[in-house]
Amino acid sequence: MIILGSVVLITLASSGGYALSVSASSPTSGPGGRSTAAHHQRQKKHDQAGPLTVVDSSPEPNATGVASDSGITVDFSAPVTLNGVTPTLSPEVTGTWQSVSATSIEFIPSAPLIPTVTETVTIPGGPSGIAGTHGATLDSSYSFRFGVANGDMLRLQQLLAQLNYLPLDFTPSGPPPPVTETAMDQPGTFSWRWSTLPPNLTSLWTQGQSNAITRGALMSFQLNNHLDTDAEPGPKVWGALLGPDPVATTGTYNYVLVSKTLPENLTLYEDGAPAYTNIPVNTGVAKAVTADGTFPVFEHLTSSRMVGTNPDGTHYDDPHVPWASYFNGGDALHGFVRASYGFPQSDGCVEMSISNAGMLWPLTPVGTLVTVEG
């Protein structure tokens, strides 16, 4: 017997010579002497007649921070054919599925993935599901989830400005982006829509960062698009902003400035210009001071029941306070009968005559900014 590597000479011929035999367990080699055992193993895996399985996906299951312009790839254990059967996405995203190799399919979106959304991909299984070319199907439907990255504050501001919710314009500096990139920041510049805007308002603006102007504009957008007015840019907000029919505002941009300098007064600006000035008001007394700051109106009621405790410990219950625009906790612009106005008398609200409150109320919807200073 002669052993040459994995080749064994073992047969004694009848003539007294040796015959060459090759062990059946000897591996074969591919080009360059490389073993093709791994290739055969992969081929066996893809050609097996057992159930079809999902072996990989991109994004991976439970991935987070996925870019809004990402595609989706699914890899199977064997060659597959779509034959009109495709995975589904929830929430739905428009696009098409196509084969990219014998064992892989890819989703090409024609719209961006909605920021902040958790997307679920479901691959149909069973007899009516996606089938391998060898006839096998997934035993059951297979699903995986991934989280889309949060939307960017700068892009939120750009979109709100283009829909006229901000007191600024946004002018893009390049061509329109591909539709799948519309959730991403675009190059361009902001500019104030009116040169007469008061510095109390313009000083609040910071590009790319959350601020009172952006929060008020977002609440106005939510109101007009029938969403919860919580000033949070969640999935429904981004879905509406990036959808086919976001509702722009056609009204004026209004802003309220309350001065606690005696005599206390209110000015309402429309599109940068003072529309109503020196409206006499009352703010909170010393033990219930109306807080300084800028706040968006979050509740807008023709009549409101107000219940609380006065600074002296007595309780009040006013069932029908007219023309209330709440802007900071329990503080609201509203009408209230007083003998006179122009100095602190309230429990924290900004009071004015009922006639003045009725005149201003239609101009202070949810999202209107109210600045209190002095």
Segments predicted by a language model, with ranges:
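Low-complexity, Pro/Ser/Thr- and charge-rich linker/hinge segments at domain boundaries
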Residues: 47-51, 141-161, 244-258, 289-292
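Extracytoplasmic
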Residues: 67-71, 92, 100-104, 118, ...
